[in-house]
Design a protein with these regions (language model features):
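Non-catalytic C-terminal accessory region of glycerolipid acyltransferases
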Residues: 2-5, 9, 137-263
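A transmembrane-helix-recognition feature enriched in membrane-embedded lipid enzymes
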Residues: 4-66, 118-122
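Conserved H-X4-D acyltransferase segment
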Residues: 14-21, 50-106
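Short, basic, glycine/proline-bearing loop/turn elements
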Residues: 54, 125-129, 160
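Short, flexible loop segments at the rims of nucleotide/cofactor-binding pockets, characterized by
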Residues: 57-60, 81-82, 130-134, 163-165
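Short, hinge-like loop/turn segments at secondary-structure boundaries
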Residues: 84, 121-123, 203-206
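Membrane-embedded segments
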Residues: 88-138, 142
């Protein structure tokens, strides 16, 4: 009796290829970053390496990346970017699409990954443990230091990747940081990464992703009490881009409905 041929779905092959490529690319560019920081190379070289890494990851996943609204950003101004969070690919898409020296608040476990963790630590990324309030406050202090060194900070105010398309309520930490530093807040919508590789997915589905930058929201002259209204305005802007003008301010899951992945 002849055995049946074993067919591997094309999507699985793409996922395996992207995973292997991403590992090699991440090790290569992480090593380059460590070396550049060690020899005190100009900052723009580090930014260039990060950008090439991000574009290589986007390419390997078969993402057709489109950026909209980046002309709204002043290259001489730094910002607090706030974005929805669906996928591991959100971060490389933001790096590849937005022409700013960006640093993220990243979960502390990423800094424990050999080579990659060393690279992001030396490049000035900021570890945050949201389960520990004291260290979380310290992380926002570190973010303020990065701002003074000329970096734009990206915050995912949902605090984790959502398993559903629906956005969760925005937490206030990033908006307090913007108010204290008096930097403009820029809501950024990531549309498409949920379909490419959402939280809990096993395979990558290549496709289009659009990163939409909205007009900066000034914070100069506003008080810390404005954090609630700023969070709601930012969430509404992103929601209308993702779901249309019918997006409601209270369109958020309850605690019982939330499905959260710590990614």
């Amino acid at each position: 009796m002849r055995s049946r041929p074993c067919y591997i779905p094309a999507r699985m092959l793409r996922t395996l290829w992207a995973a292997l490529f991403s590992v090699v690319s991440t090790i290569t560019f992480s090593t380059a970053t460590i070396i550049l920081v060690f020899v005190r190379a100009p900052a723009h070289l580090v930014e260039r390496v990060i950008n090439i890494w991000a574009r290589s990851i986007v390419w390997a996943a078969g993402i057709e990346l489109k950026a909209e609204g980046t002309e709204l950003l002043d290259p001489n101004q730094r910002y607090i970017l706030v974005a929805n969070h669906y996928s591991y690919f959100d971060i490389p898409c933001i790096f590849a699409a937005i022409p700013q020296p960006i640093r993220f608040l990243a979960k502390v476990s990423l800094f424990k990954i050999p080579i990659f963790g060393w690279a992001i630590a030396r490049a000035g990324f900021i570890p945050i443990d949201r389960k520990n309030r004291r260290t979380a406050v310290k992380s926002f202090d570190m973010a303020a230091q990065r701002i003074r060194k000329g970096n734009t900070i990206v915050v995912f105010p949902e605090e984790g990747r959502s398993r559903e398309r629906q956005m969760r309520p925005f937490q206030r930490g990033g908006f307090l940081l913007a108010l204290k530093s008096e930097l403009p807040i820029v809501p950024v919508a990531l549309n498409g990464t949920y379909d490419v590789f959402r939280a809990g997915a096993k395979t990558i589905t290549p496709g289009p992703v659009t990163v939409t930058v909205t007009p900066p929201i000034p914070t100069v002259g506003r008080s810390l009490k404005d954090k609630e209204s700023l969070a709601q305005e930012s969430r509404n802007r992103i929601g209308r881009i993702l779901f249309g003008e019918s997006f409601a301010e209270n369109d958020a899951p309850t605690k019982d409905e939330e499905q959260k992945d710590e990614g």
